[in-house]
C-alpha cells in the first residue's frame, strides 16, 4: 500500500503543481500587462511593473489553488483510468473507501497549504501591494468620505463617544487627514481634533502631528464660556482603537487574516455597527481551505469512469467547468447572504457542503453501477 500511496501522491502532486504553475503564469502575464499601462508616469519603471505583478501572485495562488487541485487531480485520475492502471489497482485490493481515504489525506495537506498561504502570506503581500501603489500615486485615498471608526468610553465624567475619520494613508503606512469628534451621552459636541497625519502605537495611543484641538464649553450656561482652540505640533491621544482595528478600517479586506477579521467584526458589534460583511468574510476565509478536500473527493469520481466514456481532455474540460461553477457559486452566495442577512457561517459553508454532497453522490453511484 505504501507503493500505491507513493505513486498516487506523486502523480497527483505533480499534476496539481503543473496546473497551478500554468494558472500563475497566466495571472502574472495579465497583471504585468495591466501594470505596463503605468509606464511613463514619473518614477515608474519596467521593474516596478514586474514587482507589482509579482506581489499579486500569492493572492492569485490562494484563490486558484482549490481549482488547480480539482483539475490536477481529475487529470491524474482520468489518466490512470485510461491506461487501466486504476483498474489494476482496484483488482489488487484498492477499495473505493481506501482510495477515498488516500485522496482525503492529500486533500487535507492541500487545505493546510491553502490556509497557511491565506493566513500568513497573502495579508503581508497585499499590504505591501497597497503601500507600493500608494507610493506611486502619492498616497491611498479612502473614497470621498474616508474611513470612519467609532469608540465608546466610560469615565468619571460620564459616557463619551468618539467618531474618527481617516482620509487616507501614505506609502509608509502613516494615517493622513485625521479628524476626531467627541460627544457626550446626550450627543453634544465636546471637542474636535484635526491632524495632518498620525500613527497608532502598540498601546493604542495615537500620536498626531500638526494637530488643531478645539473644545466647546460644557457648563450650564455655554454663552458665558468660550471655545478654546490650540495648535500643537504633536498630540498624544489615548484610545482603545488598536493598530489592527485601524488597519482593518483603512485597508482592503484582502490584507486581513482570519484572526484580524474576527477581531474587527467583534469591534464593530461592540460599537453597534454593521459587521455582517466582515463576519461572512471571516467564515469564508476560515472554510475556504476545506474546498481542496471537497474538490479532491469530487475528482476521485473521474477515476471510475470508463476510458471509452471520453478522453482526458473532455474530463479536464469538465473539471474546469466544475471549478468555475464553484467559484461563481462561492461569490454569488456571499453577495446574496450579505443582502439577505443570512447566518455568516452558513453562507460560507453552503458552496463546499453542496459540492461535498455532489461528490459523494457521484462517487457512490459510479462505484455501484460502473
Regions found by a protein language model. Give the residues of each.
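Long, hydrophobic alpha-helical segments
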Residues: 22, 57-77
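Transmembrane helix boundary and interhelical loop/hinge segments in multi-pass membrane proteins
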Residues: 73-86, 92
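Transmembrane alpha-helical segments that form the functional core of multipass membrane systems
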Residues: 273-364
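Non-transmembrane, extracytosolic/lumenal segments of membrane-associated proteins
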Residues: 47, 107-222
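Hydrophobic alpha-helical transmembrane segments
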Residues: 1-59, 181
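A juxtamembrane structural motif centered on a specific transmembrane helix
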Residues: 244-248, 356-370
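Extended, hydrophilic extramembrane loops/domains of integral membrane proteins
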Residues: 243-272
Amino acid at each position: 500500500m505504501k507503493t500505491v500511496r507513493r505513486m498516487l501522491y506523486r502523480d497527483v502532486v505533480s499534476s496539481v503543481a503543473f496546473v497551478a504553475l500554468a494558472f500563475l503564469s497566466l495571472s502574472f502575464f495579465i497583471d504585468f500587462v495591466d501594470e505596463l499601462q503605468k509606464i511613463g508616469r514619473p518614477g515608474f519603471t519596467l521593474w516596478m511593473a514586474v514587482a507589482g505583478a509579482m506581489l499579486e501572485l500569492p493572492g492569485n495562488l490562494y484563490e486558484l489553488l482549490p481549482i488547480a487541485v480539482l483539475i490536477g487531480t481529475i487529470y491524474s485520475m482520468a489518466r490512470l483510468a485510461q491506461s487501466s492502471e486504476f483498474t489494476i489497482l482496484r483488482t489488487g485490493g484498492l477499495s473505493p473507501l481506501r482510495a477515498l481515504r488516500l485522496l482525503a489525506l492529500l486533500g487535507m495537506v492541500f487545505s493546510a497549504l491553502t490556509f497557511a498561504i491565506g493566513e500568513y502570506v497573502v495579508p503581508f503581500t497585499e499590504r505591501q501591494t497597497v503601500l507600493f501603489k500608494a507610493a506611486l500615486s502619492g498616497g491611498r485615498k479612502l473614497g470621498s468620505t474616508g474611513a470612519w471608526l467609532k469608540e465608546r468610553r466610560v469615565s468619571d465624567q460620564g459616557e463619551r463617544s468618539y467618531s474618527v475619520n481617516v482620509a487616507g494613508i501614505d506609502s509608509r503606512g502613516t494615517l493622513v487627514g485625521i479628524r476626531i469628534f467627541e460627544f457626550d451621552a446626550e450627543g453634544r459636541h465636546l471637542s474636535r481634533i484635526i491632524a495632518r497625519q498620525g500613527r497608532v502605537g502598540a498601546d493604542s495611543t495615537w500620536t498626531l502631528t500638526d494637530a488643531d484641538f478645539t473644545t466647546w464649553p460644557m457648563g450650564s450656561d455655554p454663552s458665558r464660556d468660550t471655545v478654546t482652540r490650540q495648535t500643537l505640533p504633536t498630540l498624544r491621544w489615548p484610545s482603545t482603537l488598536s493598530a489592527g482595528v485601524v488597519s482593518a478600517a483603512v485597508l482592503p479586506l484582502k490584507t486581513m487574516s482570519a484572526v484580524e477579521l474576527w477581531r474587527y467584526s467583534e469591534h464593530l458589534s461592540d460599537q453597534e455597527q454593521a459587521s455582517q460583511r466582515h463576519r461572512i468574510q471571516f467564515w469564508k476565509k476560515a472554510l475556504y481551505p476545506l474546498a481542496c478536500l471537497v474538490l479532491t473527493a469530487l475528482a476521485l469520481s473521474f477515476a471510475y469512469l470508463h476510458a471509452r466514456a471520453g478522453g482526458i481532455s473532455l474530463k479536464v474540460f469538465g473539471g474546469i467547468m466544475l471549478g468555475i461553477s464553484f467559484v461563481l457559486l462561492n461569490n454569488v452566495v456571499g453577495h446574496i447572504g450579505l443582502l439577505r442577512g443570512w447566518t455568516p457561517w452558513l453562507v460560507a459553508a453552503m458552496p463546499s457542503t453542496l459540492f461535498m454532497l455532489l461528490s459523494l453522490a457521484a462517487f457512490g453511484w459510479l462505484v455501484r453501477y460502473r
